[in-house]
């Protein structure tokens, strides 16, 4: 092996290691903010209605953000630059939270943070796919570190909440975001990729295809169903007597189940249609929410509901990525992903957060809130059940 080839191999290995670290920190941050933001806001004295409204405002930023950043990355070809800029602006906007003492001040800070935060993952995925292809590596071995980071931070912050104030999630997030920003500064720039004007012009024709529209409607309904879980699950467990450590372990259990299903997802996708799998995932998600609301005091039910995260999120995510990859032309993957994130997670997530916040009533209507989520998940499944055989063209 020549000296130049040896250096290239070493640089490639270093970049893959940095990508592992970046995934660990990115999803580690999600492991702090997603489960424990409600705890932080409750500690600040906000009502369940206000918590739901703030979650909705934050989530709305995901409607505009992904498409904006995807367009900038597509047109400039500077994927890494967009990723790094997103991380820097995320840290700056998140830091303002420490000086905010009002509802709208926090809403502005969190909303700006989420707007910049949406620049990170889509670009990270592009860089990773290009890097593993050139290095002959495997995407799964890199992405696995994201799940590890989520588990580590979720459990650690859960334990810390047993001993410290409800501001712990904010301090942990600030440290994690800063470390993430630093890690991205050492990543390598991928090759510039540009789509032609003709390719860009075909995009809206592609996304108006009935199969894509059905996919977006169902995905949006499913994300509406997650509103109660994302906004109030940790508060629900606290009210049921679970400690912070136990809550962290239960959330981590869901991520472990998610990792396991990722291992078998491709075999399932090869055997069954995407529509059929997503319909089954919708039914199981409805069962998860209804059981959690009706029998949340049972340890077995709570553990079982977390294991169903393998289908609610894991298989659903794998099937959704598979659909976008196979239904859309390669030069539309980034923007297709942006549409999916923006509408399903942005509009759907915000709607679910707001409605569940209005229903929750400091936990008095927990059953009603989870029942609402179960109905939304069933509607998601129904959309696919109706159209799966007639109009679904992807496996």
Language-model features, listed with the residues they occupy:
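Multi-pass alpha-helical transporter architecture, strongest
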Residues: 97-98, 179-191, 371-395
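Cytoplasmic helix-loop-helix junction between adjacent transmembrane helices
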Residues: 111-145
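Helix-loop boundary and gating motifs at the non-cytosolic
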Residues: 9-59, 212-219, 223-240, 244-250
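Hydrophobic core of transmembrane alpha-helices in multi-pass small-molecule transporters
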Residues: 24, 93, 103-121, 220, ...
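Helix-to-loop junctions at the C-terminal end of transmembrane segments
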Residues: 65-78, 161-162, 261-273, 360-361
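Structural signature of the two symmetry-related core transmembrane helices
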Residues: 81-95, 276-291
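Juxtamembrane intracellular "pre-TM" segments in multi-pass secondary transporters
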Residues: 3-13, 187-219
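A membrane-interface helix-boundary motif in multi-pass transporters
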Residues: 159-175, 357-377
């Amino acid at each position: 092996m020549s000296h130049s080839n040896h250096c290239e191999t070493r640089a490639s290995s270093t970049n893959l290691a940095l990508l592992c670290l970046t995934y660990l920190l990115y999803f580690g941050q999600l492991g702090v903010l997603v489960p424990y933001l409600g705890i932080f806001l409750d500690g600040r004295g906000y009502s369940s209605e206000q918590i739901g409204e703030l979650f909705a405002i934050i989530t709305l930023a995901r409607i505009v953000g992904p498409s904006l950043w995807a367009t900038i990355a597509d047109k400039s070809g500077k994927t890494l630059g967009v990723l790094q800029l997103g991380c820097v602006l995320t840290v700056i906007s998140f830091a303002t939270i420490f000086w905010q003492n009002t509802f709208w001040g926090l809403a502005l800070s969190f909303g700006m943070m989420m707007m910049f935060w949406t620049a990170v993952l889509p670009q990270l995925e592009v860089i990773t796919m290009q890097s593993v292809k050139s290095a002959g590596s495997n995407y799964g071995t890199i992405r696995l570190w994201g799940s590890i980071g989520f588990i580590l931070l979720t459990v650690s912050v859960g334990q810390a909440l047993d001993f410290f104030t409800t501001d712990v999630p904010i301090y942990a997030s600030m440290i994690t975001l800063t470390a993430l920003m630093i890690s991205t500064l050492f990543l390598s720039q991928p090759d510039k990729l540009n789509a032609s004007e003709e390719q860009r012009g075909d995009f809206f024709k592609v996304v108006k295809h009935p199969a894509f529209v059905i996919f977006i409607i169902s995905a949006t309904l499913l994300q509406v169903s997650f509103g109660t879980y994302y906004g109030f699950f940790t508060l629900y467990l606290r009210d049921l007597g679970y400690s912070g450590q136990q809550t962290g372990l239960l959330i981590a259990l869901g991520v472990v189940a998610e990792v396991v299903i990722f291992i078998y997802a491709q075999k399932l996708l090869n055997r069954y249609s995407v529509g059929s799998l997503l319909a089954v995932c919708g039914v199981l998600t409805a069962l998860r929410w209804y059981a959690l609301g009706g029998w949340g005091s049972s340890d077995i039910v709570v553990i079982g509901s977390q294991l169903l995260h393998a289908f609610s999120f894991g298989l659903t995510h794998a099937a959704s990525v598979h659909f976008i990859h196979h239904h859309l032309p390669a030069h539309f993957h980034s923007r297709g992903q942006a549409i999916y994130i923006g509408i399903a997670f942005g509009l759907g997530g915000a709607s679910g957060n707001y409605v569940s916040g209005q229903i929750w009533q400091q936990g008095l209507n927990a059953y009603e809130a989870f029942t609402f989520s179960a109905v939304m998940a069933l509607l998601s499944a129904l959309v696919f059940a109706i159209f799966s055989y007639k109009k679904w063209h992807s496996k």
